[in-house]
Curated annotation (Swiss-Prot):
Residues 1-21 are annotated as: Disordered. InterPro entries: Euk_RNA-bind_prot, Hud_Sxl_RNA, Nucleotide-bd_a/b_plait_sf, RBD_domain_sf, RRM_dom, Sxl. This is Protein sex-lethal. It comes from the Eukaryota. Residues 125-203, 211-291 form the RRM domain.
Amino acid sequence: MYGNNNPGSNNNNGGYPPYGYNNKSSGGRGFGMSHSLPSGMSRYAFSPQDTEFSFPSSSSRRGYNDFPGCGGSGGNGGSANNLGGGNMCHLPPMASNNSLNNLCGLSLGSGGSDDLMNDPRASNTNLIVNYLPQDMTDRELYALFRAIGPINTCRIMRDYKTGYSFGYAFVDFTSEMDSQRAIKVLNGITVRNKRLKVSYARPGGESIKDTNLYVTNLPRTITDDQLDTIFGKYGSIVQKNILRDKLTGRPRGVAFVRYNKREEAQEAISALNNVIPEGGSQPLSVRLAEEHGKAKAAHFMSQMGVVPANVPPPPPQPPAHMAAAFNMMHRGRSIKSQQRFQNSHPYFDAKKFI
């Protein structure tokens, strides 16, 4: 389709589609098409005109479907290495609801990071980078890890509406050796007063269910190190996030803490829920983030006047004209006649119409 025999083909791409072209229909969300990215994300997509990173040679160009973990059809797909002096930070479409809910309790859209997370190869080459500075850019992340070796994909997880960084990222190397070296070299380094944690990304789905905790009533002076001290006793903390006031930057007394195993999360709940921490004045509320999300959704539904499916509907009310007729009639009737009338009309409540 894209060979030299086709007059409309790109003769400089070695028979592959033009770089960044997704041959599979995706509703306009093709890789490398910044205009098709969700609002607030287009500025994070690198274009071929970027000068800080060299454009891949014709021998290494691939369509988006050919990259590992990106929904390729047939075979093992192409590779994004052999890029000479540089690579490009590919931003795949947004992660699926299930994947992102597992990661931060949010639902941000639909797309394809689940493939990358669930790819069996990802456990050996796909890394998660925690505790990134809030102002760190995708370019800086790429430059930091590209020094180790060729990269398939790298991306900082952000709120797609605001561009706000969640403080962690995924970096997928092309070789296991480079991913191992990245952990050994970059884990624990300090970047703008933030100590990075680099480790292998775990598969998504059931294996990380019930590991994310929602914590409230924390001291308003809580720090990352203090949160580690409080919760680190009960297991390996994969990710933590202290929520802060947007204006002052001070902690709001709320945090998310994700453990490596659900048993560790349950142990932390048993040990810390309703316990006053050192420096605090209120007992902590520690529960699963999923439970908090369900309670929040139920509260929102009640505020909107939406009745949950498991709540029975209210009993039927009498028509307005019958209620008005009863209101006029009962005034001239005795109590006995009112009771007799009401008994013959079980849906009427006399108190409502007095």
